[in-house]
Amino acid sequence: MDVALEDNHIALLQHRAKNSGNTVLFKLPILRGSEPPQEWNHITVAEFAAEVDRVAIFVMTELKARGIPPRSAVTVLYSGSRYQDLIYAIALARASYIPQMCPHILTHPGVIFALMEKAGSKIILYDPSLEPATTDCPYPKMALNPIETIDSSSTINSDSALPTIEDLSSGHADVCFFYLTSGSTSGSPKVVPLTQKFVSTYYKTQFGIWLDGRRFDTQNAFLSRGSICAVAPIIQYFGCLYTGSCIVQPSKMRFSTEELLTLVNVCGLNRMTTFGTWLAPHIQAAKKDPAALKLLQEMRTVSYGGVPISIADDDWCFQNGIPLMDMYATTECGTLMVSAPGKPARFMQPVPGISYRFDPFTDTTTGADNPASTQLLKLILLADSPQIPQPQLLSEDGNFHTGDLFEKQLDGSYLFRGRGDDWIKSEDSRFIDTKAIEEKINDVCSDLVKGCIVVGHLRPSPALFIEAYHDSISTISEDGLKELVLRRLEDFNARQLKHERITDKRLIFIVDEGNLPRTV
């Protein structure tokens, strides 16, 4: 395969379809009611490529009819968790457009439209169920129908020929995707452009980390990483396409250990890739069930990222021969750290090939260095690294400051020690800016609240602890105070991602005046 074409992911797909088209790329569950699936449809590379071309003709025809020129950014608003969501994204690229991946958890129209403007998007394509999020849209819009309802023959005409692969093989610096960070900054996620070079680096070098350097006689079968509106699942797709591996989709991301057994026995699943919160129940099952333990022990890798598992579970897995692998990554840079060999998974080391630096962490609030007994280090990706993001995402020194902290061990490995700011993570690894929520409450509830603190690391939703003024709780019930706070937060919540919102009064806790640690 021509080296220049290999750097274009559509060229890679066409090449694989031609030369190894019978290789299975996806295994999709056949769902019948609420019962766990027992059968999976196998989709080969050739079948996937043909479906991409069919849908690409449709979207190209529709976009041209709406005056959207090739190489335009096109926003797609959907869950990203369905097979057809991936088809639509790759079909847009096949038709010479640049998808901007917009997850369904963004529900405020103003935020969505602002993100479209930042990416230079010309139109929004959306899941029909998300129509309310496109209200008063200043851009053209088009609902995405199920791909099986698309009649390609009705759109074929003299102008319907797809671009040649050579025409798509643009320069390394050309953007081929826009992604969004998983948490809001100043009320909005950051727009992260991915270039052709950046994407090819993912599948040509980075995906080898997922394979941990070992070769097997049978196909690598990876558990799906979930919504392609996040970077990890699209890396997984490219990597599996490039290496001849396949992706196995479960009925849902939080599935039972019983279904895991079926995934292994029926689909040949041999590499787990998930969040720590979704892995933990299977580890608990393995502690009680020898069959579940054997299943995890025989996996080629059990990798997780974004959200850790407990130290106790990590140690137990290490002692019981479960091949755990922790992966530290960012939307902007991809994978930067991976588990060091011969130790529990939480002990990590930088991945080969990146250029990085660890600087001592200084508390910018007080200007004082952190205590010497726990030397925290900031991870910085240097400008000459192959995975360096676009200039607009870099600091003034030309490097990328991750904002994450690590503690170096005597053997040279590193332990992740959280972030250097006030962020926490939800249970599925999405960031929450607790400081922004606290500041808003102090602003809109200044007559009611003396102080507040937002907590909930690795929980489904943040929780709010309020120290109310004595006069507030003497004139209104606790439930009444909670409801009043929620009403005053409505406008703020509307602009936040779903996982960042506090909308349930059961997640608000009133403490006596003087009992909130941050305010005493």
From Swiss-Prot:
Gene3D superfamilies cross-referenced by the UniProt entry: N-terminal domain of ligase-like (3.40.50.12780)
Protein name: AMP-binding domain-containing enzyme iboA
Induction notes from the record: Expression is highly induced during artificial growth in symbiosis with Populus, which is close to its natural condition.
Motif FACS: chain residues: 397-447
Keywords for the protein's UniProt record, in alphabetical order: ATP-binding, Ligase, Magnesium, Metal-binding, Nucleotide-binding
Function (record text): AMP-binding domain-containing enzyme; part of the gene cluster that mediates the biosynthesis of the psychoactive metabolites ibotenic acid and muscimol. The first committed step is glutamate hydroxylation by the 2-oxoglutarate-dependent dioxygenase iboH, and the last step is decarboxylation of ibotenic acid to muscimol by the decarboxylase iboD. The order of the intermediate reactions is somewhat ambiguous. IboA likely activates the carboxylic acid at position 5 to introduce an amide bond, and the flavin monooxygenase iboF generates the N-O bond.
GO biological process: fatty acid metabolic process
Domain notes: The FACS motif is required for catalytic activity and substrate specificity.
Pfam families membership: AMP-binding, AMP-binding_C_3
Membrane-spanning ranges: none
UniProt EC number: 6.2.-.-
Pathway field: Secondary metabolite biosynthesis
Record-listed ATP binding positions: 180-191
Single Gene Ontology MF annotation: medium-chain fatty acid-CoA ligase activity
Source lineage: Eukaryota, Fungi, Dikarya, Basidiomycota, Agaricomycotina
Protein species of origin: Amanita muscaria (strain Koide BX008)
Cofactor(s) in the UniProt record: Mg(2+)
Domain of life: Eukaryota
Similarity remark: Belongs to the ATP-dependent AMP-binding enzyme family.
